A protein has these predicted regions:
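Amphipathic alpha-helical coiled-coil segments and their boundaries
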Residues: 118, 125, 152-155, 159, ...
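Acidic interhelical loop/turn segments
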Residues: 140-161
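Amphipathic alpha-helical dimerization/coiled-coil segments
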Residues: 89-137
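Alpha-helical transition-metal enzyme core signature, strongest for iron centers
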Residues: 25-28, 55, 132, 163-173
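Long, compositionally biased intrinsically disordered regions
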Residues: 153, 160, 168-172, 178-219
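Non-transmembrane amphipathic alpha-helical segments
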Residues: 125, 132-143, 166, 173
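Basic helix-turn-helix/winged-helix DNA-binding cores
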Residues: 1-101
Length: 219
């Protein structure tokens, strides 16, 4: 049985393309781009060929034929194996049913928010909010085009999910901006004071922790 290695969504995308029909890697990439799947799965040709080689080693796909079209280099066409078909079902079932702990870069930045002065953070959050607004407007335009083209919702549901996440993020960013600007954010005074201290004592800026409340860490 093929060893399980389900860390790369691009591998799943390749398997699902081959579940439709045998393809060569370039055709897989073209299909994914035509269907806008590269917006949900990180795609570049270098990594794609590495993924294809890995899937073949694991017995999930197999070379069906090698062919040449005109002056183009030879291309190997791959097909999905029976083991690969089972893997598609099991992998997709796992992804849909089981939440996985991701580590978003913005969440990491929030965890170290006090390392920057509050006023600078507010400026940066305003910039982020503006970018999110632009992205949401673009996403709405894309959805409108899809609807006008008569594409069923199930075809672009991942874009809908992405928009919901971005709307939630934008709402949170706006709330955080408001709480900082109004002075209502718990710990804001401590946050300002550590930067005042850092100006006088270089190297004195502490890493934020959850061991104590801000007023306890000042002592």
């Amino acid at each position: 049985m093929a060893a399980r290695n389900r860390s790369n969504p691009l591998a799943l995308a390749v398997l699902i393309c081959l579940a439709e029909r045998p393809m060569h890697p370039y055709e897989v990439a073209t299909t994914l781009r035509q269907r806008q799947k590269h917006e949900s799965v990180r795609l570049n040709y270098g990594s794609l060929y590495g993924v294809v080689e890995s899937l073949e080693r694991r017995g999930l796909i197999a070379a069906q034929e090698t062919r040449r079209e005109g002056r183009l280099p030879e291309r190997t066409v791959y097909r999905l194996t029976d083991t690969g078909r089972i893997e598609v079902h099991d992998w997709l079932t796992e992804l849909i049913s089981t939440p996985v702990r991701d580590y978003p870069a913005f969440e990491a930045a929030l965890s170290f928010l006090p390392a920057l002065p509050p006023d600078q953070v507010v400026t940066l959050l305003h910039e982020r909010a503006q970018r999110l607004e632009v992205e949401l407007a673009q996403a709405a335009a894309t959805r409108e085009l899809a609807q006008k083209a008569g594409l069923p919702r199930v075809i672009w549901v991942e874009h809908e999910f992405d928009a919901v996440l971005r709307e939630a993020e934008l709402g949170y960013v706006r709330t955080l901006i408001r709480d900082i600007e109004s002075g209502g954010l718990d710990g804001l005074q401590w946050w300002r004071e550590i930067h005042d201290t850092a100006d006088d004592e270089p190297g004195s800026l502490p890493l934020p922790t959850r061991d104590a409340r801000p007023d306890e860490r000042k002592e």
